[in-house]
Structures are given as structure tokens and as C-alpha cells.
Swiss-Prot record:
Any one Gene Ontology BP term: chromosome condensation
Job of this protein: Protamines substitute for histones in the chromatin of sperm during the haploid phase of spermatogenesis. They compact sperm DNA into a highly condensed, stable and inactive complex.
Similarity comment text for this entry: Belongs to the protamine P1 family.
Gene Ontology annotations for the cellular component aspect, listed alphabetically: nucleosome; nucleus
Protein name: Sperm protamine P1
Major localization class: nucleus
Tissue: Testis.
Subcellular location: Nucleus; Chromosome
tRNA processing among keywords: no
Keyword line: Chromosome, Developmental protein, Differentiation, DNA condensation, DNA-binding, Nucleosome core, Nucleus, Spermatogenesis
Species assigned in the record: Myotis daubentonii (Daubenton's bat)
Length: 47
């Protein structure tokens, strides 16, 4: 499964195989056919 890269805003997310490297950045996640940034950093690390 492809991993998501960290994004600055909730609406903008880019899909990459890298994990989130900063706590301030939000992780991108797929939600209802759309990519959204998750608020918790721990969730980004899991996927």
C-alpha cells in the first residue's frame, strides 16, 4: 500500500512512499475518495 506524505494544509495532500518526518506537519490520508490530512501524527506513522 502506498504511504502518504505530510502536507501543510488539510485540503492539499500528496501521495508518496515516505512517512511523516515532522510532528508539526500533518499526514495525508484517503477519506471518501478524497485525500485528507489527519490531525494526529501517530496515525500517519502507522500507515
Amino acid at each position: 500500500m502506498a504511504r502518504y506524505r505530510c502536507c501543510r494544509s488539510r485540503s492539499r495532500c500528496r501521495r508518496r512512499r515516505r512517512r511523516c518526518y515532522r510532528r508539526r506537519r500533518r499526514c495525508c490520508r484517503r477519506r471518501r475518495r478524497r485525500r485528507v490530512c489527519c490531525r494526529r501524527y501517530s496515525r500517519c506513522r502507522r500507515r
